[in-house]
Each structure stands twice: as C-alpha cells, then as structure tokens.
C-alpha cells in the first residue's frame, strides 16, 4: 500500500512516498520536488558477518542520464563509474547518517539513491539526503533519525533555503547543512569571505528550515508502521575486561603521551601484543575481544587527559598549533611549488598553468560545462608508513580535494583578467591529521609562487571536539589520533577577512550552537596564526610567472572574422600554430587567447591573425601587391583577402595614359586608403602615398612622382 506525505520545504512542495516502488527493499521512498524525482532504497543483511568488528555501510548515488533526457556519451552508451560529483554526493549522504546507527549494529547496510528525473532548480542531492533518512525510517533497520539536509545561500544579505541555480550565481555562500531535531550533524560548503557570525547564522537558519521535513518523515514512518529490528546489547566479558585493565591501564596511560606518532603506535602495538600473549592461556580464543578492550582503554586515556588536565597527546594545550615550516619555489621546472609542514603532516603542492584547451569537460544532467580550476589531492600509503594497492583516487581523496578546491576558488582572479586553466596537485608526504588543510595552505603558497594574482592568502585548520556529559574541550589543529578518538572533525579555511570553505563531521548525536560558535572563533585565531607563518616565506604573489609557464595574450576580432582566422578545414589556424609554435584558443565571442613561452612567437602569431582579420581603414598606409591590371586602374591586395582599387587618376601626381606605365601585376606598391563605401569596396591611392615611408614618415630619398 502506498503512503504519501507532502511538506513545504523552503517555499517549495516536497512529496515523500513509500510502498509503490522497490517493495522488496527493507525501505524505499520516492522523493519529488518540482520535476526532480529520486528513488532511495535501504537494505541491511539479516545478520552480521561472523567476526565483524566495524559497521559496513555503503552509499551509492547515481544520476541516470535519462533523468535529464539524455543518452550517455560513453562508448557503450550506458552509465559507467561514478563521476566526481556523484562520488561527492555519496559522501554527502553517508556522513550525516553514519553516526546514527546503534554502536553494536554491524550488519552490511546499503543505501542506493537513483536520480530518475531532474530539473535545474530542485537539487537531487538534497532530496537524496532526505530520501536516505526517510528510507531508513520506514524500514526495519535500526536508525536513530530522522535527519534532513538543506542547502543555504545568501543574496544581498538575505538567507535562502534551497536556492535555485540563478540565485546561487548571485549568492556569496553555498553550504549544505544536515541536522536532527536538536542539533547540527554535518556542514560543508564554500563562501566568499563570510564572517564566523554570519556563517553560524546560516547554519542554524538551515537547522530551522529542516524541521518540517523531519516531522514529515516521522509521519511517514507512522503510516508505514514497520517495527524496528531488535539489536541485542553487546555481551561484555567482565572478567576479561578486568584483567585487561589490570595489565594494561598504566602502560596505556603512559603510551598515549608519547609525542611521536610512530613511536606511540609502536608502543601501543607492543602493549597489545604482550597483553594478548599474557591472557592467551587464561582466555583462549578471545584475541579480538582483548584488542577491542585495549582500543577502548586508549580512547578513555586520551579523552581523560584532555578533559581533566587540558593536555593533549603531543603535550599541547587545546589552542596551540603545531610547529609550521614552509618553503616555496623548490621545484625548478614547475610553474609554482610549495612545501608545507605542520608537525608530522607534510604536503608538497604544485601549481600548473595551462590554456583553455586544458579545461576539464564535465557532463551533467543539465548539459556540459567546463572547469578552469582543478585541485587534485593524493594520499599515498607511504605518508602513513603503510603499503597498499593503488588504483586511482578513492572517495576520501576526491572529497579532500574538493574541500581544498572550494577553499581556494574564492581567491582566484576572474577569467577575463587571468585567462589560464589552473591545476593544483597536493601530494601528501606525511600525515598525522589535517592533511586536507595542508593542501589548502600549500596550494595557496604554490599559487603565489606561480605568480597567480590571488585576492588574498588563505589557510585552513582542522578543529576537534571531546565531549563527555557537560565536559567539553575544543581542540585546534588536531592530530590523526585526536580525529579518530574524538567526537568531531571540523575543517575551516579562509583568509583574514572571512571563511571560504568549511566541513564538519561528528560521531555523536549533534553539536549545539555554543560549541560551534566557540569552535569557529578558535579556528579563526588558529587560521590567522598560520597565515602569519606562511607570510614569513611568501606573503604575496610573485610579480613574474615562471619562465616555463605559458604567456597568454588576449586579442579580440569581430565574430564574423572567426571563420577567416580558422580558414577552410582549419587551414589558417593550423598554419599559424605550425609556423609560430603557439597555442591558439578561439571563443565564440571573438576572444582569442594566444599562449606561448616566447614573446617573439606570440607577436608573430598576433601579426598573422591581424593579417587575416584586419579591415581597411581610411587614411591608413598599406604595402600591397598588384593583383590585376585593368584599363581604368589596378587592384591591389592590401590585406589577406582584401583588395582595393587604385583608379588610374590616383596612380601619380602627373597624368598617366596607361596603368602599365606605373604598375604591373606582382609589383609591391605603397598605397593609402582614401575610402570604403557602404558595400565594403576599398578605394586606394598611390598618388597620396608618394614621398612617404610605410610608417607615414617622409621618404627624403625618393622624389614625389617616382
């Protein structure tokens, strides 16, 4: 039986229905707003796999080409591997729901969101976030929801819930907020130098906006009437737990205070191995349980130290930033490079400048578009002292790269002012927390090293949270272990003027406004400190670009002259590029970008293009070639494809009986344009050019009339 709930969400109607499609899934809903429809299903295995010790949640999001009335452009004409935007949406759905499953629920669980119809003004990503929660709510899968996501924009100081594409063009922020009844669960987005207070207002504007949608999910859950599965509480062997604590408590408390990541992990591994060996005979077959108890013990020791004494793993207090070292211009053949080191986290970041032909073509439900700024984040296994099989970037690398890309996009010059394609690659060389923020800091420095005229330097910092009851500690510049053992990972990037990007994930039920306000204020202090350290090495863009970077010169031609530049079958443009070695990009507007590392080659290409597109100007001198002799005058080619008539009366100051007395076909002759009629016919005069050089100066060595 189908159940339907309608709700107004940000001024637009949203319909959530269940019981009509995909009825063999544990939970399935169709979410519709405007002409956008998303089918979201939730399925969990009946039992957890034997020995399972983590929650295997998988989220898939697919935009079907037919949803936009298109046929896929791939060779096989069907949807292939997920695009980067689809991968990012998978993460967007996953992150807010993951902390809301019971801790001891370890069954394989899969959420699949399929966009089956799409229009431009109703974002399927937001509807998919809503659908994932709703599908879990109407299923028998245990879930501590509901939650919902909302996109928030701001135009002329007015906050907008789920803005349209046109509104986003004018907005100075685009953030996605996921929230429950009482708290914020996830935030991510970008902005143009928005203050901490304004960002906080936008986040909680989003929190208020999702409340009607949460009520609608609860109503749909009641209509569906599906009982939740029982999740038996975990069985704890109290005798084993007591023995583990007896043997390892003091040693673990000391181990978590070791500052070096590798030494600390080695000591914890040693404690684990020795404790397991000591208890092997007494508690045979319980090795996995012993390791779990030791993990809990590490968790408790780290958190207790921070909450009770304010001392962190590496001895810092809650606000201190790790030591920072920066270097710029260390790779001689690249266009821009920087090495950013913060504690045991290090990133080598490189900027490369290209032309519009290097832009990335992106295909979406709404058509093709091009990206001129790309940031790719790499996380090789050696950065954490491990080995693994590498097959392209994973979801985490794509997500971290996009966060850093958003952080830096706000400071880039406009395309008209700087017509380059920009690619930044961040190679994580060492990682002990905040590697994505190292990509932001190093990326900014590499842009400046490349001579990109950015509007302001940008830095990023990762904030953490440890919360037990009423005790709260907010941590600046968190370590990897503080991320793993803490309750929040809150990344904030921006300039001294405001925030350009942020991303927050939590592992608890949510965070309050007070916690977020303090975290944002503390993040600003840390960000300003990092910007100061970066400025000690490089505080502004270099005045000159690398000699290895292409120089792009922009010229304009009339749109009806574009075909003349290209030529039949591309003949002219091919001749220009082969002759000069430059790269030429022609836009439909008549804008032509010429890229070359050689000024001479660029000047020659401009001359050749001008020769193809210039039009005769009255009063201007031209050195032309006689193409045809007639009784009444001579036709002279003054520009490629442009002839003009020199009437017999304009050949000389004295009377000329026949044209051939003065000119013959193939002669080079200096002429002056004396007019262009309404039909484009050019009138030339040799007579008025006599006694002049081609540049218009008097030719003293040639008497008039010769």
Curated annotation (Swiss-Prot):
It is found in: Cytoplasm. Its cofactor is Mg(2+). Gene3D superfamilies: GHMP Kinase, N-terminal domain (3.30.230.70), K Homology domain, type 1 (3.30.1370.10), Nucleic acid-binding proteins (2.40.50.140). The keyword RNA-binding applies. It comes from the Bacteria. Residues 619-687 form the S1 motif domain. Mg(2+) binds at residues 483, 489. CDD domains: KH-I_PNPase (cd02393), RNase_PH_PNPase_1 (cd11363), RNase_PH_PNPase_2 (cd11364), S1_PNPase (cd04472). It catalyses: RNA(n+1) + phosphate = RNA(n) + a ribonucleoside 5'-diphosphate. Keywords: Cytoplasm, Magnesium, Metal-binding, Nucleotidyltransferase, RNA-binding, Transferase. NCBIfam families: polynuc_phos, PRK11824.1. Belongs to the polyribonucleotide nucleotidyltransferase family. Involved in mRNA degradation. Catalyzes the phosphorolysis of single-stranded polyribonucleotides processively in the 3'- to 5'-direction. This is Polyribonucleotide nucleotidyltransferase. It comes from Pelobacter propionicus (strain DSM 2379 / NBRC 103807 / OttBd1).
């Amino acid at each position: 039986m189908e159940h339907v709930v309608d709700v107004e969400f940000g001024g637009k109607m949203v319909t959530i229905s269940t019981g009509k499609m995909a009825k063999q899934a544990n939970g399935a809903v169709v979410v519709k707003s405007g002409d956008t429809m998303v089918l979201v299903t939730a399925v969990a295995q009946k039992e957890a796999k034997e020995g399972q010790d983590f929650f295997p949640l998988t989220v898939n999001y697919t935009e079907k080409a037919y949803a936009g009335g298109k046929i896929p452009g791939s060779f096989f004409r069907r949807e292939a591997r997920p695009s980067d935007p689809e991968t990012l949406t998978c993460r967007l759905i996953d992150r807010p729901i993951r902390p809301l499953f019971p801790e001891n629920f370890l069954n394989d669980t899969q959420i699949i969101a399929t966009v089956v119809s799409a229009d431009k003004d109703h974002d399927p990503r937001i509807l998919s976030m809503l659908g994932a929660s709703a599908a879990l709510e109407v299923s028998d899968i245990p879930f501590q929801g509901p939650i919902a996501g909302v996109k928030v924009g701001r135009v002329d100081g007015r906050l907008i819930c789920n803005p349209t594409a046109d509104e986003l063009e004018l907005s100075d922020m685009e953030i996605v907020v996921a929230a429950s009844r009482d708290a914020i669960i996830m935030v991510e987005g970008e902005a143009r130098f928005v203050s901490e207070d304004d960002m906080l207002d936008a986040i909680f504007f989003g929190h208020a906006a999702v409340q009607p949608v949460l009520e609608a999910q609860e109503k749909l859950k009641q209509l569906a009437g599906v009982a939740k599965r029982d999740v038996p509480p975990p069985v704890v062997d109290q005798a084993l737990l007591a023995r583990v604590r007896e043997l390892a408590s003091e040693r673990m408390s000391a181990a978590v205070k070791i500052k070096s990541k590798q030494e600390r992990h080695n000591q914890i591994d040693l404690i684990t191995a020795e404790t397991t060996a000591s208890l092997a005979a007494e508690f045979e077959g319980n090795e996995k349980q012993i390791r779990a108890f030791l993990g809990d013990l590490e968790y408790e020791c780290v958190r207790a130290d921070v909450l009770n004494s304010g001392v962190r793993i590496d001895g810092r207090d809650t606000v201190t930033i790790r030591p920072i070292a920066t270097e710029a211009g260390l790779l001689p053949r690249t266009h821009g490079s920087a090495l950013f080191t913060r504690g045991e986290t290090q990133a080598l970041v490189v900027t490369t400048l290209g032309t519009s032909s290097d832009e990335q073509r992106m295909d979406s439900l709404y058509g093709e578009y091009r990206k001129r700024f790309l940031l790719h984040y790499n996380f090789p296994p050696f950065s954490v002292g491990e080995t693994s099989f590498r097959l392209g970037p994973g979801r985490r690398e794509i997500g971290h790269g996009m966060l850093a890309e958003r952080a830096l996009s706000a400071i880039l010059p406009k395309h008209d002012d700087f017509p380059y394609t920009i690619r930044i690659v961040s190679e994580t060389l060492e990682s002990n927390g905040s590697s994505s923020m190292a990509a932001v800091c190093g990326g900014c420095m590499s842009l400046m090293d490349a001579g990109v005229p950015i509007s302001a330097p940008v830095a990023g910092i990762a904030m953490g949270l440890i919360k037990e009851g009423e005790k709260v500690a907010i941590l600046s510049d968190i370590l990897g272990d503080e991320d793993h053992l803490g309750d929040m990972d809150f990344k904030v990037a921006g300039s001294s003027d405001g925030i350009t990007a942020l991303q927050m994930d939590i592992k608890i039920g949510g965070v309050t406004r007070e916690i977020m306000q303090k975290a944002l204020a503390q993040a600003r202090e840390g960000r300003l400190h990092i910007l100061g350290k970066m400025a000690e090495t490089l505080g502004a863009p270099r005045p000159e670009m690398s000699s290895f970077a292409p120089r792009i010169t922009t010229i304009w031609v009339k749109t009806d002259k574009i075909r003349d530049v290209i030529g039949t079958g591309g003949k002219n443009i091919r001749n220009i590029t082969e002759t000069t070695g430059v790269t030429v990009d022609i836009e439909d507007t008549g804008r032509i970008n010429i890229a070359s590392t050689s000024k001479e080659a660029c000047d020659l290409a401009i001359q050749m293009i001008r020769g193809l597109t210039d039009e005769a100007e009255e009063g201007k001198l031209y050195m032309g070639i006689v193409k045809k002799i007639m009784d009444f005058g001579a036709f002279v080619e003054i520009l490629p494809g442009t002839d003009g008539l020199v009437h017999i009366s304009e050949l000389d100051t004295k009377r000329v009986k026949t044209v051939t007395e003065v000119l013959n076909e193939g002669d080079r002759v200096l002429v002056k344009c004396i007019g262009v009629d309404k039909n484009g016919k050019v009138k030339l005069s040799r007579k008025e050019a006599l006694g002049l050089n081609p540049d218009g100066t008097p030719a003293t060595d040639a008497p008039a009339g010769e």
